[in-house]
Curated annotation (Swiss-Prot):
RNAP is composed of a core of 2 alpha, a beta and a beta' subunits. The core is associated with a delta subunit and one of several sigma factors. Residues 109-173 have a biased composition (Acidic residues). Keywords: DNA-directed RNA polymerase, Nucleotidyltransferase, Transcription, Transferase. This is Probable DNA-directed RNA polymerase subunit delta. One of its GO terms (biological process) is DNA-templated transcription. The lineage of its organism: Bacteria, Bacillati, Bacillota, Bacilli, Bacillales. Residues 14-81 form the HTH HARE-type domain. GO terms for molecular function: DNA-directed RNA polymerase activity. GO terms for cellular component: DNA-directed RNA polymerase complex.
């Protein structure tokens, strides 16, 4: 039965979902959600306030009802019109390739590599600069002082042993 053949009482007794199914069957093509809802609101003589209150409910009902299929961009059709393979193709978006980001990362790495290129001559210059900063004489002086300190300690220990030996000799006599 066509929508135009329905009486006002019959329309009032039909749910918005049933009217949505009838509208899509009559048009025989996918339609925008708002267009479907506006036709329902016109058939049911909704006021502007009723339209605002019922719009979200109708959208929820379409999502929950198993007879509808969203095709993206606000377009809805009847699920039975579309084979499973076709519906999945229309719904599924192709993932975007992220090659641009990878190229940017590669460029950054190349820049870092350029900064890290150091020649052997540059390394030799750095090492010789470090060597100039160290005063070899100071190092040798420090070693000499350490050696003298050790010799002094040894002399003191030997002197202490000599004193002990003398004391032992005195006690044994």
């Amino acid at each position: 039965m066509s929508l135009q053949q329905l009486t006002h009482d019959e329309i009032d007794h039909l749910s918005m979902i049933e009217l949505g199914v009838k509208i899509l069957k009559e048009e025989n093509k996918a339609m925008n959600y708002k267009v479907i809802f506006n036709k329902i609101a016109e058939l049911k003589d909704f006021t502007d306030e009723q339209k605002q209150n019922m719009m979200a409910q109708f959208y929820t009902d379409m999502n929950v009802d198993g007879r509808f299929l969203t095709l993206g961009s606000g377009m809805w059709g009847l699920k039975r019109w579309y084979p499973v393979e076709q519906a999945e193709e229309e719904i599924t978006e192709e993932p975007k390739k992220k090659t641009k980001k990878k190229k940017k990362k590669a460029e950054v790495i190349d820049d870092v590599d350029d900064d890290l290129d150091v020649t052997d001559d540059e390394i030799d210059d750095i090492v010789s600069d470090l060597g100039d900063d160290l005063d070899d004489d100071d190092f040798e002086d420090d070693l000499d002082e350490d050696l003298e300190d050790l010799e002094d300690e040894v002399d003191e220990l030997e002197a202490d042993e000599d004193v002990e030996d003398e004391n032992d000799d005195d006690n044994t006599r």
